[in-house]
A protein has these predicted regions:
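Conserved ABC ATPase "signature" region
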Residues: 1-13
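A short, proline-enriched helix->beta-strand linker immediately N-terminal to the Walker B motif
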Residues: 36-40
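Catalytic Walker B motif of ABC-type/P-loop ATPase nucleotide-binding domains
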Residues: 42-45
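Helix N-cap at the start of a conserved alpha-helix in ABC-type nucleotide-binding domains
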Residues: 53-55
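Helical segment within the ABC ATPase nucleotide-binding domain
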Residues: 57-69
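A short, surface-exposed alpha-helical micro-motif characterized by mixed small hydrophobic
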Residues: 83-84
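ABC ATPase "signature
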Residues: 101-102
Length: 142
């Protein structure tokens, strides 16, 4: 465990209580703990949340390495740019229902989109986000 704490930059803070850690520091500890028993299935909820850029890059590489070792990784994320770089297969939900389940490349091809965000927009038909943003600014300025 000592070596793991050094690798993720928490060695100097190893004696601090978990409550004293930042969200990103807690996230690193929880991710390490989830790997300790070498699970075949790893379930992560928003694993990139709260991580600094370097830690997120390490996690992305770690997830790729785990997948290469035939580990199944199931994780939720609202950050589509990260999902696009990490996930082999995605499941897109709209109001609790599955609207797509395929590889990122296949979804982009079928939907004629260059990004996962474009696929998501087509499949979920979200509200006009630009109009909402402008309305918020109008209300705040008033």
């Amino acid at each position: 465990m000592d070596e793991l704490l050094r690798l993720i930059g928490l060695w100097d803070d190893r004696h601090a209580g978990l409550a004293g850690y930042s969200k990103g520091m807690r996230q690193k500890i929880l991710l390490l703990a989830s790997l300790l028993h070498d699970p075949e299935l790893l379930i992560l909820d928003e694993p990139f949340s709260g991580l600094d850029v370097n830690a997120a890059m390490i996690l992305r590489s770690l997830l790729h390495s785990l997948a290469a070792r035939q580990k199944m990784i199931l994780y939720s994320s609202h950050v589509l740019e990260v999902v696009e770089k990490v996930a082999h297969t995605v499941l897109i939900l709209r109001k609790g229902r599955v609207v797509a389940h395929d590889s990122v490349a296949r979804l982009r091809e079928v939907m004629s989109e260059s990004s996962l965000e474009g696929v998501f927009t087509q499949l979920t038909n979200p509200e006009d986000t630009d109009a909402i943003a402008h309305r918020i600014l109008d209300v705040v300025a008033a």
